[in-house]
Amino acid sequence: MFGLIAILVFMSTRETKKYVKDGKKEQPDFAYESLLKDNDGIIVLCYHRVLKDTVVTNFAYSISHNSQLHEYNVFLQDFEQQMTFLKKNHIKVLTSSELIEKLNKKEVIGKAVVITFDDIDKSLPENAYPIMKKLDLPFTQFIITGKVGQTIDGSQMSTWKEIKKMNENPLITSGLHTNDLHYQENFEPILSTNISKKVVQKDYQKSQKAFGEKLDQKGKVFAYPYGAQNKDLEDYMLQDGIQGIFTLSPGVVTNETLYSNIPRLIVTKDNWKTIKHWLLSEGTQ
């Protein structure tokens, strides 16, 4: 039991979107009140792990001062309530392809959401996916292709078999989350460093190769690990036909949003109230 608690306390230490140069982690602001001011727009929700509400996880939460344990994990009960809210209130939930189509046509009118998951650990197929399937809600899963089936900082990644099964659902979109560039050096995401153009291009090629071999398709959307943008990678992906690039820069998608810089909101229990309030104010897609 103590081993499980230790894993839960430390499993989220790699998940952060902003760093300062001296290596000290800068705390991201997930409040969002000041951002949700647009009358029309699409918010892209970002989830990482959806955990069952157990004695072990509750104890880990109560003793941990690691804010990332609270900010990057959502309890299953809370997640189900959030998805049920979207369904019962007839909030339009778009696929990532529908979002990109609206951007291209400048047809972002009213309000809607897109649901995304990063990394794709076991909690998606085991906990979150059954709820999404039951409620008939679309989502996009961003996959670290080189880490599928492995354990990363205490999180057991989903297998290709699990990913493929979800991908067979027409409501599910599979996207790229790099092949093996989801890590940090000196508290800085590797894509934020002076990593060479050759390295990022080769990594992207490996991701696309894995998609072709395992899912029999080409990835059309991409999400930056930690939200760390890289111009060399962006240019290369756009030339290769990537249709949408997602960041972790908070904001609302409007007709002015570039499909190469699509903002997302990391969902927490605390900021969900703000998100709900915005969605229930004027207009829907």
Named regions from a protein language model:
Residues 1-11:
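Hydrophobic membrane-insertion alpha-helices, especially the h-region
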Residues 10-111, 285:
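N-terminal pre-catalytic segment of deacetylase/amide-hydrolase enzymes
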Residues 45-52, 110-113, 121-123, 130-230, ...:
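Metal-dependent polysaccharide deacetylase catalytic core of the NodB/CE4 family, i.e.
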Residues 52-57, 125, 271-272:
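Short, solvent-exposed loop/turn elements at domain surfaces
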Residues 62, 131-134, 240:
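Glycine-rich, phosphate-binding/catalytic loops in enzymes
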Residues 71-105, 212, 234, 238-272, ...:
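C-terminal domain-boundary segment and adjacent tail
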Residues 272-278:
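Functionally critical loop-and-helix segments that line ligand-binding/catalytic clefts
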